[in-house]
């Protein structure tokens, strides 16, 4: 499973751990991803999405149908 939010497109970022002595070691900042099922009333079925917590807030704000429409448009453009 790729660590990418299907709504926002958030991906892991790279950076440094910085010690008290200012020594830097590489690390990854991972997005807070959750697998969630959402009910689609139009299609009368569930859909499972891998979304970040920020993506969940977007779904709460805009609605699952509007967000799913944007995801499907983005997938068509990439093909």
UniProtKB/Swiss-Prot annotation:
Transmembrane segments: none annotated. It holds the Pfam family Ribosomal_L28. Residues 11-20 have a biased composition (Polar residues). The keyword Ribosomal protein applies. Residues 1-26 are annotated as: Disordered. One of its GO terms (cellular component) is cytosolic large ribosomal subunit. This is Large ribosomal subunit protein bL28. It comes from Coxiella burnetii (strain RSA 493 / Nine Mile phase I). The gene is rpmB.
């Amino acid at each position: 499973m790729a660590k990418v939010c299907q709504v926002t497109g958030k991906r892991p970022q790279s950076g440094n751990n910085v010690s008290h002595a200012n020594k830097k070691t590489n690390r990854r900042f991972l997005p807070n991803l959750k697998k969630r099922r959402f009910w689609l009333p139009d299609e009368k079925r569930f859909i499972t999405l891998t979304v970040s917590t920020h993506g969940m807030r977007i779904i709460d704000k805009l609605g699952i149908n509007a967000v799913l429409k944007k995801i499907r448009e983005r997938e068509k453009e990439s093909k």
